[in-house]
Swiss-Prot record:
Transmembrane regions: 238-258
Name of the protein in its database record: Ephrin-B1
Organism of provenance: Homo sapiens (Human)
Pfam family name, one: Ephrin
Induction details: Up-regulated in response to TNF.
Disease: Craniofrontonasal syndrome: X-linked inherited syndrome characterized by hypertelorism, coronal synostosis with brachycephaly, downslanting palpebral fissures, clefting of the nasal tip, joint anomalies, longitudinally grooved fingernails and other digital anomalies.
Gene: EFNB1
Assembly information from the UniProt record: Interacts (via PDZ-binding motif) with GRIP1 and GRIP2 (via PDZ domain 6). Interacts with TLE1. The intracellular domain peptide interacts with ZHX2; the interaction enhances ZHX2 transcriptional repression activity.
């Protein structure tokens, strides 16, 4: 017979084996090589841009580098766009802002997590075997930060093509610049946009580095025609809070109604119980007479206490009637009192 220690060790080994098999069966997520969003980055190939092949669970950091001495700082606004927008280098319609590079004194790092389902309703969501595009139509200067046409997307092909869950060996070089069908544009991503001046300071304690996570961004979603309008986001939040508040009010009203109903039922039950108790107390007073009396006394004779007036008792009994059955006596038992306090009720 196995000892308890051996049983525990066997269960532990089985659990470790199952865990190892699950880890082997599940592809390990990894951090992809960060992308520096700068015109000096040689990874942005002319006419093609930068193509990456992330898997579900991977993470990608897009870095806005700090200003270097002797070189002007490059201002960019990065968008997650549809295939036709990336091909035309246009963000006029439905602009979905990812991050804004507008802080020369610090490095800004934007992290993208490739996940099919996001715990944040404003987070990014990706699907396998789909292409996603990131580009910028800014020209690098502060004055051209808000450009919606051309920019470095057209002049330097600064764009990232993310082929999620796809095999890099199965893609030919001619397919790198092709756009996906427009029917897939609606399923690209649930986008979280960021206004240039609405993001608070998220940098480190030295004030030289800033990390922006896609789950922490706020703004309108990518679906629908109002994704570029900030009012749409606030309206959606107001509608959400209004729905939650209405649900709470309805829940409180139901609780109050049930509480009042329960109190009424308990009060009615208590009143009914008191009435039954009073009836039982009267029935106990009317008890049959015992058979230990004389021979002429019948066992069915009933003794009923005489009602009194003004709490005065009368030690008197009277035979009420015996014409239609057994005689009935009304008897009031009490300790002897002075004759002055005795009243007879006729």
């Amino acid at each position: 017979m196995a000892r308890p220690g051996q049983r525990w060790l066997g269960k532990w080994l089985v659990a470790m084996v199952v865990w190892a098999l699950c880890r082997l069966a599940t592809p390990l997520a990894k951090n992809l090589e960060p992308v520096s969003w700068s015109s000096l980055n040689p990874k942005f190939l002319s006419g093609k841009g930068l193509v990456i092949y992330p898997k579900i669970g991977d993470k990608l950091d897009i870095i806005c580098p700090r200003a270097e001495a002797g070189r002007p700082y490059e201002y960019y606004k990065l968008y997650l766009v549809r295939p036709e927008q990336a091909a035309a280098c246009s963000t006029v319609l439905d602009p979905n802002v990812l991050v804004t590079c507008n802080r020369p004194e610090q490095e800004i790092r934007f992290t993208i997590k490739f996940q099919e389902f996001s715990p944040n309703y404003m987070g990014l969501e990706f699907k396998k075997h789909h292409d996603y595009y990131i580009t910028s139509t800014s020209n690098g200067s502060l004055e051209g930060l808000e450009n919606r046409e051309g920019g470095v997307c057209r002049t330097r092909t600064m764009k990232i093509i993310m082929k999620v869950g796809q095999d890099p060996n199965a893609v030919t070089p001619e397919q790198l610049t092709t756009s996906r069908p427009s029917k897939e544009a609606d399923n690209t991503v649930k986008m979280a946009t960021q206004a240039p001046g609405s993001r608070g300071s998220l940098g480190d304690s030295d004030g030289k580095h800033e990390t922006v996570n896609q789950e922490e961004k706020s703004g309108p979603g990518a679906s629908g025609g109002s994704s570029g309008d900030p009012d749409g986001f606030f309206n959606s939040k107001v509608a959400l809070f209004a729905a939650v508040g209405a649900g709470c009010v309805i829940f409180l009203l139901i609780i109050i109604f049930l509480t009042v109903l329960l109190l009424k039922l308990r009060k009615r039950h208590r009143k009914h119980t008191q009435q039954r108790a009073a009836a039982l107390s009267l029935s106990t007073l009317a008890s049959p007479k015992g058979g230990s009396g004389t021979a002429g006394t019948e066992p069915s004779d009933i003794i009923i206490p005489l009602r009194t007036t003004e709490n005065n008792y009368c030690p008197h009994y009277e035979k009420v009637s015996g014409d239609y059955g057994h005689p009935v006596y009304i008897v009031q038992e009490m300790p002897p009192q002075s004759p002055a306090n005795i009243y007879y009720k006729v």
